[in-house]
């Protein structure tokens, strides 16, 4: 059980590192827009079961690799990239604006008139965690830590530890 718990902790760290390496997102943004939870490790008929759960909301597009980062006026083109493997793409009919409460975001008009406008968002942290590259790396890391800790726990018990 302690080996499984240590593996889940390592999995959480690996998720954050891997998400950061695949997407243009900072650790502060990951922690602000998501919640990471553990299902407690349980003994069932089919063995030990444990899981890591991610919950969170979509992240404003301005938090990714976007130019310009400040509010602009006129016909300044907005370019954005969400994944590190992709280059910035120009977003047609988008603009950067600062709202009265101070929030800066990437917006687009819903119609030809000035209002209403809607903010553009990137993927949420749970959606990023579903990426195949991220999942594979995290799974490998969790298995590696569990196997190492299992050996350590067995050695401890066999050598008379409590």
Indicate residue ranges for each PLM-predicted region.
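Short, Lys/Arg-rich flexible segments
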Residues: 1-162
